[in-house]
Amino acid sequence: MLSLAKAKLAVVGIGRQCVAVRTLNGARAVHRSFSSSEHDQDSSTSENELFDIIISGGGMVGTAMACSLGLDPNLTGKKILLLEAGHEKKMDKIPETYSTRVSSISPGSATLLSGLGAWDHIVNMRCKPYNKMQVWDACSDALITFDKENLQDEMAYIVENDVIVAALTKQLQTLSDHVKVQYRTKVVKYTWPHPYHVSESIPWVQVALANGKTLHTKLLIGADGPNSMVRREAGIPTVKWNYDQSAVVAVLHLSEPTENNVAWQRFLPTGPIAMLPLSDTESSLVWSTSHQHAEELLQMDEESFVDAINSAFWSNENHSELVETAGSLFRMALSVLMPDSGSARQLPPSVSGIGPKSRVMFPLGMGHATEYIRHRVALIGDAAHRVHPLAGQGANLGFGDVSYLTQVLSQAAYNGKDIGAMQHLLEFETERQRHNLPMMTAIDLMKRLYSSNTAPMVLLRTFGLQATNAVPPLKEQIMAFASK
């Protein structure tokens, strides 16, 4: 349950629409007006130019890192560069159709994005809050719900990844006096400094670009995704495995308009299926299943695919009489011990269609860098950790990295210290692994627990789900941990 809870972040109220979350206090609340400019990859940097910080990777987490550093008053005057291999992500006009790649943004991440000045842009584009989550087992009647006491408060927000990147990019343009950005720039090699000064050794990280230039930096931040070149070339080992599963994602059209403020997740014998709200009439599908079944789902005609989705959420074909009887007796015992516990089951909305060309599949796996840092190197986001989407925590873990690494570097700069020194980076690694590892372990265990439909395993998780659902303080702790 720990993992599923993650998506159910506790936090700021925002009414029916996504309204601006409170800005961070202290340094992050300081706003400056800077001129916006286009970033030209040829004129932005000169040969052998030395930067204080170079960020490799301009996705959601890398761009957030650049904004966060550029806004920190203690880092004013530091030379910061963001390198991105792709084009600049702009969204001058909101697309009529929704993207299949979305993230569940926790209250903690929403607060970070607000402090960076990006949340208002997201609100002006589009996002969908939800204030309840229902998770239930396809092999029994066990369920658990997470909600806020005040249903006007949001647990989380479903936001398209493209919207997040576009909002951060727009904000980054206002920081052009503090952060340089080079798009369409490919790194071909990193050369690492010796951890101890030796004669004729290079003191900084060297970054060789495909255009022939070589840059130098006192600190390299790898935000270049699960196949991180920074991590690989730094020789940082990774513990990883594939789940023999693929996720099928799609945009769903609901049968009728609804308030659509509930996130739904059901654990099927083949993997979890989730329906996340996008609007009053559309939701996002994330269906984790076997590779073969995923291929079959992609090949189905639309009508068959829609029928398969509705059946996955509504069918009781995997129930067993033994489990139902045992679960019913356990539920009765809980109601005697805790009369006010439990939750009323809600029925998910039915699906009537899918967005055009919105069905996509991708393989699932887990990965964790054994170290987040090396001398003058730090890893953040998917470069450091990759998780199963069943908990919706991938982006939130990355934004947590951004927040804490900024804090550590800001303090080092304030104290006049070397921002690339291991002393400060170790603090970042310790704190983030302390948070990320329990979350990743819970997600992995949850995935494995629900991968079996044998009677003993189904009974174990049925009792566990019902017991957790009957103890509100425990659910509150789960939500609090997931909302960070």
UniProtKB/Swiss-Prot annotation:
Its EC number is 1.14.15.45, 1.14.15.46. GO terms for biological process: ubiquinone biosynthetic process. FAD-dependent monooxygenase required for two non-consecutive steps during ubiquinone biosynthesis. Required for the C5-ring hydroxylation during ubiquinone biosynthesis by catalyzing the hydroxylation of 4-hydroxy-3-(all-trans-polyprenyl)benzoic acid to 3,4-dihydroxy-5-(all-trans-polyprenyl)benzoic acid. Also acts downstream of coq4, for the C1-hydroxylation during ubiquinone biosynthesis by catalyzing the hydroxylation of 2-methoxy-6-(all-trans-polyprenyl)phenol to 2-methoxy-6-(all-trans-polyprenyl)benzene-1,4-diol. Its cofactor is FAD. GO terms for molecular function: 2-methoxy-6-polyprenolphenol 4-hydroxylase activity; 4-hydroxy-3-all-trans-polyprenylbenzoate oxygenase activity; FAD binding; oxidoreductase activity; oxidoreductase activity, acting on paired donors, with incorporation or reduction of molecular oxygen, reduced flavin or flavoprotein as one donor, and incorporation of one atom of oxygen. It is found in: Mitochondrion inner membrane; Golgi apparatus; Cell projection. Component of a multi-subunit COQ enzyme complex, composed of at least coq3, coq4, coq5, coq6, coq7 and coq9. Interacts with coq8b and coq7. Pfam families: FAD_binding_3 (PF01494). It is an enzyme of class 1 (oxidoreductase). This is Ubiquinone biosynthesis monooxygenase COQ6, mitochondrial. One of its GO terms (cellular component) is cell projection. It is a peripheral membrane protein. It catalyses: a 4-hydroxy-3-(all-trans-polyprenyl)benzoate + 2 reduced [2Fe-2S]-[ferredoxin] + O2 + 2 H(+) = a 3,4-dihydroxy-5-(all-trans-polyprenyl)benzoate + 2 oxidized [2Fe-2S]-[ferredoxin] + H2O; a 2-methoxy-6-(all-trans-polyprenyl)phenol + 2 reduced [2Fe-2S]-[ferredoxin] + O2 + 2 H(+) = a 2-methoxy-6-(all-trans-polyprenyl)benzene-1,4-diol + 2 oxidized [2Fe-2S]-[ferredoxin] + H2O. Keywords: Cell projection, FAD, Flavoprotein, Golgi apparatus, Membrane, Mitochondrion, Mitochondrion inner membrane, Monooxygenase, Oxidoreductase, Transit peptide, Ubiquinone biosynthesis. Belongs to the UbiH/COQ6 family. HAMAP family: COQ6_monooxygenase. Residues 1-41 form a transit peptide. Gene3D superfamilies: FAD/NAD(P)-binding domain. It comes from Danio rerio (Zebrafish). Pathway: Cofactor biosynthesis; ubiquinone biosynthesis.
